[in-house]
């Protein structure tokens, strides 16, 4: 028989038994690993694959095993023969030879009996094994483990001038409560850095492409990410920024979520065209950039951080989804220290495109490495769909089920939960479907003992809890609600993998396409030219993009060229510009028919049929239909397929809806303000931390830097709002009482406190006998500021009423 001899830690065990049994065990482990790896490869479930490392210890006997029961008896017999206490001999022998040793439990019991951060453990040997085993279990508790197994070790200890280093103490990352005029707030490294609650509105297409929901979350004091995936042109971005600036309260800021691996978007937004930094330079209140969909190489990332900081973005975040990517971000943070870097670890239960990595696996594998880097601020997301689950991650209680110390994070990402918010453009029918979708539980018993711990999974190509995992046009896994659109997607994936079925299943494919918001255009060879134009208008109007009208114009001009009686040369078109077709395509078609009645009888030629896909691809914005059934069918259908879920013209059954499978279960309301949704997450954290916090509560003026006064808050604010424009704060980083940057309170108006930031300037004549007083010069620049401690996440705002007097005085000093 094989016995579990020793439990060294939550993940390290020692087995004892006959050599042949242990060898057979190794064979079975390899078989089970192969089976589990196949389940992962086939995307039946995600999480860490069962893959234990087996190593033989250099021993000749199976210690801590029932096989050694006779040896214990023999030891007792020898003890009796030598007149040694037999019961004591039995106890000692059994501990070495027979009994299971739960080393991890014994270490935890020791730490529970005292404050681990004050405990020192001396390892007198032999060797250093015991100290290493102790450190593994005690990781994150602050225990000090000191090697003292050799004379040299002990001699070194006797001459130490400072205390030896301790293991990491993760309790220092535990959240606490601060009492502010805005109410009780949770304090973490994230709130201290940003001044915003540890509940983040994640960037996600399509929900946070539009500015209304982003602005509403920011106005309530939350980190809110504008999704860069939907800012596809400079014109679209300009329009969204204009609306954002209109919706944002003065002193509020948002963040921009950029897709690094999408080279077109990255070049547009931060590469050659730099539309986002240019907007920031003009004062747009965007103060952070989240680099998602890939992690840059080290040198590129370091340069990027420095560039973004210089461009006015004090907050730069990376969004890794694998262990290797997390470690890459750790290296990046180390290279730019002490500059603060945010890391948004996202597990495979996040909505939309997803990995098969479990959030808990990612954190368990890398938490110690992340926490070793003091300038990293840790945010987690993916499957955090309820306020209670969010509180689990903020307090660190999520890790207890794995036998680990508390592993608190500094903030949590919320995405799926806001898809039905009042400010979300999600159509009413889709919102109702989201509420009706049961989703899957975060935790559920699994009959397979080798299944990974952590969250549950929706198998690829199957439906579970009303959610399925399909493939996007990028051939990447994507979560979506189970509906006609998802079923169509599965069929197209099947045909993509078996192209020989394309023709035989053509009618089935067309039927599936026509049940979605992106139907098949139709067989052009069966249509007349007039029917071609009418079908285009029926499927594309109202135009959601101006280039739809451009393509319709070009289609009508093509039809004119075909049906006109003129044989060659140029002719004067009925439709000279977009204005002729934009407002009423049906009127344009009627005009075409009146001028060319033959268009209602002539069939589309093969040449024009071949030209049609070229017209469809004329502009980057895909058309809302599939123009042709060919081997590129999945891309034709899958491109640009998310905006329809925000258009009431389309039924919820026909559109692609992409929530996370776990978080969708937490959606219970329709048209609840996003501030209230995020507020429920925040209040659950406040309640939990208030009950569990080890740290003493403290009073504070604001969350930013846990500032205790308005002056300290002003000096810790990286930006100020100047007449609606975000600009760098000249007093940022200065110490309280700095004589060059004097801050004076000048009044109060309700909850708003009024201050003057007086910047004292040097002049060329300061060393003159009279101190330069006889010379006309600007010796002070005064910036009047308003700060409101009753509002969370609000930066200092320049007082528009008091500003003119200071500007006029400066002009007078300049003019003399």
Model region roles, listed by residue range:
Residues 1, 28-49, 80-84, 113-117, ...:
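Alpha-helix termini
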Residues 1-164:
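Acyl-group transfer acyltransferase/transacylase scaffold of fatty acid/polyketide systems
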Residues 8-11, 19-21, 58-63, 126-128, ...:
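Glycine-rich beta-alpha junction loops
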Residues 13-14, 57-60, 95-99, 123, ...:
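Glycine- and other small-residue-rich loops at beta-strand/loop junctions that grip anionic moieties
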Residues 61-64, 125-131, 205-208, 231, ...:
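Gly/Ser/Thr-rich loops at beta-strand to alpha-helix junctions
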Residues 158-171, 195, 247-253, 297, ...:
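Extended charged low-complexity segments that act as oligomerization/scaffolding linkers
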Residues 164-373, 593-816:
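Active-site entrance/lid segments in N-terminal catalytic domains of soluble metabolic enzymes
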Residues 308-480:
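Glycine-rich phosphate/ribose-binding loops and adjacent secondary-structure elements
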């Amino acid at each position: 028989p094989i016995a579990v001899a020793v439990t060294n830690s939550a993940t390290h065990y020692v087995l004892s038994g006959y050599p042949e049994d242990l060898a057979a065990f190794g064979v079975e482990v390899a078989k089970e690993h192969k089976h589990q790896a196949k389940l992962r490869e086939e995307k039946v479930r995600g999480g860490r694959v069962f893959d234990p490392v087996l190593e033989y210890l250099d021993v000749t006997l199976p210690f801590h095993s029932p096989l050694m029961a006779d040896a214990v008896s023999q030891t007792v017999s020898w003890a009796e023969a030598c007149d040694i206490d037999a019961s004591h001999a039995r106890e000692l022998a059994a501990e070495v030879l027979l009994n299971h040793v739960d080393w991890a439990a014994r270490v935890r019991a020791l730490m529970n009996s005292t404050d681990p951060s004050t405990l020192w453990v001396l390892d007198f040997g032999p060797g250093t094994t015991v100290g290493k085993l102790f450190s593994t279990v005690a990781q994150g508790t602050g225990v000090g483990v000191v090697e003292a197994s050799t004379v040299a070790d002990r001699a070194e200890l006797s001459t130490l001038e400072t205390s030896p280093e301790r293991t990491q103490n993760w309790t220092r990352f535990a959240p606490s409560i601060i009492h502010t005029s805005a109410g009780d707030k949770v304090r973490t490294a994230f709130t201290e850095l940003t001044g915003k609650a540890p509940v983040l509105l994640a960037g996600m297409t399509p929900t946070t492409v539009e500015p209304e929901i982003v602005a509403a979350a920011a106005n309530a004091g939350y980190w809110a990410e504008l999704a860069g995936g939907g800012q596809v042109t400079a014109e679209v971005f300009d329009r969204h920024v204009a609306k954002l600036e209109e919706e944002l309260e003065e002193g509020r800021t948002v963040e921009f979520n950029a897709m690094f691996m999408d080279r077109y978007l990255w070049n547009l937004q931060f590469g050659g065209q730099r539309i986002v930094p240019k907007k920031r330079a003009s004062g747009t209140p965007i103060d952070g950039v989240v680099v998602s969909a890939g992690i840059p190489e080290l040198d590129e990332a370091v340069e990027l951080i420095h560039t973004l900081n210089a461009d006015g973005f004090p907050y730069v975040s990376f969004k890794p989804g694998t262990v290797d990517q997390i470690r890459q971000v750790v290296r990046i943070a180390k290279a730019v220290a002490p500059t603060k870097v945010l890391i948004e670890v996202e597990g495979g239960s996040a909505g939309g495109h997803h990995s098969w990595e479990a959030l808990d696996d990612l954190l368990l594998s890398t938490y110690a490495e992340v926490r070793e880097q003091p300038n990293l601020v840790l945010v987690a997301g993916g499957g955090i769909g309820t306020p209670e689950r969010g509180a689990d991650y903020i307090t660190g209680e999520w890790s207890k089920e794995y036998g680990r110390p508390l592993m608190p994070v500094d903030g949590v990402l919320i995405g799926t939960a806001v898809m039905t918010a009042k400010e979300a453009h999600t159509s009413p029918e889709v919102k109702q479907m989201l509420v009706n979708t049961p989703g899957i539980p975060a935790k559920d018993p699994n009959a397979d003992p080798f299944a990974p711990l952590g969250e549950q999974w929706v198998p690829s190509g199957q439906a579970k809890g009303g959610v399925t995992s399909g493939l996007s046009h990028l051939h990447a896994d994507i979560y979506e609600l189970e509906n006609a659109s998802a079923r169509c997607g599965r069929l197209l994936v099947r045909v993509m993998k078996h192209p020989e079925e394309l023709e035989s299943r053509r009618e089935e494919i067309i039927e599936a396409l026509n049940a979605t918001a992106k139907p098949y255009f139709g067989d052009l060879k069966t249509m007349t030219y007039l029917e071609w134009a009418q079908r285009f208008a029926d499927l594309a109007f109202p135009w959601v993009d101006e280039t739809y009208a451009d393509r319709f114009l070009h289609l009508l001009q093509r039809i004119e060229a075909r049906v006109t009686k003129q044989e060659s040369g140029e002719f004067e078109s009925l439709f000279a510009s977009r204005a002729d077709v934009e407002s009423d395509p049906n009127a344009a078609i009627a005009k075409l028919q009146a001028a060319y009645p033959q268009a209602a009888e002539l069939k589309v030629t093969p040449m024009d049929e071949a030209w049609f896909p070229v017209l469809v691809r004329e502009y980057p914005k895909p058309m809302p239909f599939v123009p042709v059934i060919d081997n590129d069918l999945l891309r034709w259908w899958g491109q640009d397929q998310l905006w329809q879920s925000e258009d009431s013209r389309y039924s919820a059954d026909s559109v692609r809806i992409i929530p996370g499978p776990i978080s969708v279960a937490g959606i219970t309301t329709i048209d609840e303000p996003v501030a209230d949704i995020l507020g429920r997450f925040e209040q659950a954290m406040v309640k939990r931390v208030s009950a569990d916090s080890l740290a003493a509560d403290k009073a504070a003026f604001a969350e930013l830097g846990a500032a205790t006064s308005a002056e300290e808050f002003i000096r810790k604010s990286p930006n100020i709002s100047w007449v609606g424009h975000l600009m760098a704060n000249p007093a940022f980083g200065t110490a309280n009482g700095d004589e060059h940057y004097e801050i004076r309170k000048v009044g109060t108006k309700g909850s708003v406190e009024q201050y003057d930031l007086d910047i004292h300037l040097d002049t060329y004549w300061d060393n003159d006998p009279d101190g330069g007083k006889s010379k006309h010069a600007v010796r002070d620049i005064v910036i009047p500021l308003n700060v409101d401690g009753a509002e969370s996440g609000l930066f200092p705002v320049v007082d528009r009423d008091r500003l003119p007097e200071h500007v006029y005085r400066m002009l007078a000093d300049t003019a003399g």
